[in-house]
């Protein structure tokens, strides 16, 4: 069992106080209706250091670890699944610049993102390609830098982004095979087209867009990291990303459980509170055990990452465990609410939608099981 430090408990308290002051049901409903998170709430979250809490203070980050980022995500998402996720996603992508960028890139791009003045949108997913596959998009080198072409899908924060991060195939050098590279692209560059991909079951506060790059000119300083290292960078990105998402999923699971408990404590059936029935207690017990098991798994993964001991398997297990716990908790919460659980008036249906959307992000359950299974079985002769 990981014993949280005083500073880590303070992160939880700060997140709880913020959410209680900023999150409410009507704000969440209105934001989801229009598909846009209130910009002023982003600003206040950034002012408290919630955007990029695990990134260096030198670039306006929080200077803490991934475990603190997980605690923040869990707390925010437990209090409101939709609004909490939107705050957590405000700085998504900044970690790539912090991990792989040059000193100049970090100084130029990170402070505006982490201070809430702009956003970065991660454009990695392509139609017909596995999430870890070499990209079909290309970046052709010339004497002025690169020419970027390709189409990306399911890009969150695209509408409010100041920059995109993307992955494109680049020619292999003398020591590179199957090379791909990561790039920083100005959102207002000529040749970029952003198209809304429509409403989704969940995750609507961060949007979802198709982004097309058509002969987009990139100067040499827009290469993120070394040429040909894009797939290795992608693997490192997914390891951190999955643990962060596991923190969000853990919050969704806890939030759904708390709402189920609150309902069974007050709902009367056959002249008794339904929380008094053994079948209800058993359902709640099973959920509580599953959520606590997920919590231990996620905290351990985050602590391992901070200690430099995490790997793809650790991250995949954390996200798989937490995401499936979130879906199970939200599903059972709906069942315990009866017909009311399906109504928009109650929050549990929204937790289910957000949990389902999150389970498909940065690796669906099948992708994660592939990672874990391959690691456990090892290479076959």
Model-derived segments and spans:
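Alpha-helical interface subdomain recognition
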Residues: 1-79, 83, 88, 100-105, ...
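Short beta-strand-to-turn element immediately C-terminal to the catalytic PLP-Schiff-base lysine
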Residues: 99-101, 140, 166-170, 184-186, ...
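A short, Trp-centered hydrophobic/proline-enriched beta-strand micro-motif
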Residues: 116-125, 167
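Short Gly/Pro-enriched turn/cap motifs at secondary-structure boundaries
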Residues: 127-130, 154-157, 173-174, 200-207
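Flexible, small-/acidic-enriched active-site or ligand-binding loops
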Residues: 134-136, 188-219
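A short core secondary-structure module
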Residues: 149-195
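A short, charged helix-loop
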Residues: 211-236
